[in-house]
Amino acid sequence: MREKFKTLRDKFKDKISNLFHKLNSVQKDYYTKTLPKACKDVFTLGSSKSYPMTLNFNKGFCVGLYKGLNSLKPTYYDAPLSTLIIAPPGSGKTAAVAVPNLLNVPSSCVVLDIKGELFDLTAGYRQQVLKNKIFVFDPLGNNNTLKFNPFDKRIVEKLDFNRKRRLVDEVGNTIFAEDGANKDPHWTQQAKNLFVFYALYDLCVHNASTFFEIASAPIKNYVPLINPQSRFYTELYECQSSDNGFVKENGRYMAKVENGVKKMKPNVNVELLWYKQVAEQVYTDPENPKNYDGSVNNLEKDDQGNIIMKEGMLDPIIRNEANKWAKANDKEFASIKSVYSRFMQVFTSYQVKSATDSMSFEYEDLRADNISLYIKIAQTDIDTLAPLIRILLESIAKNLLLKESKKFEERVYLFLDEFVRFGKLPFLLEMPALSRSYGVVLIFITQSNALIEKYYGREDARIVNSTVAYKVIFKMDDLEYAKQVSEEVGKMTRKTRSHSTEKGQLITGGTSSIGKEAWDLLSAQDIMNIDKDEVIILVSGHKAKPLKLKANYYFKNKELLSRINWEVKPNEEVF
């Protein structure tokens, strides 16, 4: 009899065990079964029909491979929405996301390519088949083919004073970004103000400038800039005079000459004379005689006391700034220029000067043409070039938001691999919430959410996590972030049943109760223990339906393998 009861008990335990195993399997695989629902119809890129998860098996940006009955189907999204990719080192984020999409997306792409691997693998195919002009921005390398200067004449001559001022302000904010070690931001802010003055003066007077010229401004030779028509010319040179004062010829003071050389006065602060001269400059043309005849003291004003601006006049803001620097305390000014030189040091490099002395393209060309821009920076040069790379990325991004575009062929992708390495890019972090109607797609790629928090702060990390439409998550060891993702997905409510028996009763007798409990749809352990070749996809608005797909490794795809390592030719030979 005892053996009979033991057999019944073991069978009961086996049934209960199998039941819970099945329930667990259903729960664990729940998120693998939602994609067919989202893709149950025949999707076409650009279709006006709305689909639940904006995913398709046809075209767009590939997030992974869906395992069908007999094949792996590439799964895309074609909306102009941004993506965050979290993948630890060695997980294959480059091989599974960046490379396959660069071999597939036909429109313009801007690619952060620290190792140069993406260029080597994809540039040739993009040039010869996808018909993209190829540029490489590698200022300290030997294969730079891109010129980038946000102050190029082609750009600046289209701008009025307010837009010129906004441009130099934005560039200044990017260069003079404060870090945690900066104990007194006063000097950094003053150095930025000095940058704005130098740059804005050049843009207003010459309609152009370069980083090298602006970086060299505090130490350049100001002697040629003191105009012979200016009263400060007589403070620089020994000038010819008569009983009636200094002699002028054609409105210009005449310097005394000895041995063919103008005779300068000793111990003259020529830089200070230039600031004073600019403080009296009325017109943008330095040769205009009205700059030197006292007109600055008799400018026409409106009823509110504002100077009435006429064509060719220099904005009074520049004169006021020049006057401020002319009156600055010598010791304080020296400290400001020291901080200025520290931030601007990178732009004094002759290699950087060559890479930033003109502009290879206009921002609108990224929409009008197909352009692939690879930003290749050696690991050892990242800290040095980070300010320049930030300026390049933010200049492109901001100018792409000046005009709306919903045409697929005008879409621009920004592949921001290891973007945290280049310092804070606050504007780019906010772009996912703004860029949809402008056709700009940002692909943020990083090794962990913890790195975003380290370089940007917890709040900024929360912003980028909440504004992207898609997340592609590889197997990770970050328990805190795995829990965060699990909480985003949410929980399901399931029924539970408990059974209790009286002492000595094995099966019969006792009581049972039914209750409910919350159960993670996707647990932190699920995330941390997915297979190496799998990814989890979260879609905004559908996070309760996470997808588990196969990673789209290019080296496992014969078609993609046939597209890599093509030769890159000079653009003029192809186009």
Residue ranges of each PLM-predicted region?
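N-terminal accessory nucleic-acid engagement/regulatory domains that precede
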Residues: 1-46
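P-loop NTPase motor domains
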Residues: 15, 23, 27, 59-62, ...
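N-terminal pre-Walker A segment at the start of P-loop NTPase domains
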Residues: 38-74
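Glycine-centered flexibility motif
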Residues: 46, 64-65, 172, 206, ...
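Conserved ATP-driven motor cores of ASCE-family P-loop NTPases powering translocation/secretion/packaging/pilus
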Residues: 432-434, 438-536
